[in-house]
């Protein structure tokens, strides 16, 4: 079986630390940071999405588009005007569905987003990835700002 759906039953198989081997890459990590191929991305650094918060997990995805959101939002929230980076990564330990997006607006994990408390090894970089329209990114940033104002910008970490 490849991917988060079981071919026999068409029901989603949740991805947990104990049950993640059925998910195959490639995997991507979108970020504002410049990282060398061969380096390991580890948890324990500041969150890109909440100032002053240390992230206990590293987040990654099986979709370039989802990684693009990570890269674009991280750079926009940093306010540095730079273009984000998308890296091809391999998890060095077990991982699980990202509970911040799984079964939220849509059933399942449509963004194919995962998180781990273990390192991710950078094995390459995605060059020439297509970003989202600036107005769409602004809309997402405005939505995040509204959630923050309402105290609803909760990150399950």
Give the residues covered by each predicted segment:
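Conserved NAD+-utilizing ADP-ribose enzyme module
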Residues: 2-25, 32, 48-58, 64-157
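Short polar catalytic/cofactor-binding loops
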Residues: 30-37
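Short, polar loop/linker segments at the starts of domains and inter-domain junctions
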Residues: 37-49
């Amino acid at each position: 079986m490849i991917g988060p759906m079981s071919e026999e039953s068409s029901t989603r198989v949740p991805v947990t630390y104990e049950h993640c081997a059925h998910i195959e890459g490639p995997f991507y990590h979108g970020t504002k940071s410049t990282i060398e191929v061969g380096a390991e991305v580890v948890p324990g650094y500041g969150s890109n999405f909440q100032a002053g918060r240390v992230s206990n997990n590293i987040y990654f995805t099986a979709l370039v588009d989802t990684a693009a959101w990570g890269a674009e939002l991280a750079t926009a929230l940093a306010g540095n005007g730079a273009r984000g980076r998308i890296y091809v990564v391999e998890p060095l330990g077990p991982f699980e569905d990202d509970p911040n997006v799984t079964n939220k607006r849509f059933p399942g994990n449509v963004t194919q987003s995962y998180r781990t408390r273990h390192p991710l090894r950078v094995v390459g970089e995605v060059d020439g990835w297509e970003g989202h329209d600036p107005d769409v990114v602004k809309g997402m940033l405005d939505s995040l700002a509204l959630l923050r104002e309402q105290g609803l910008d909760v990150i399950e970490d």
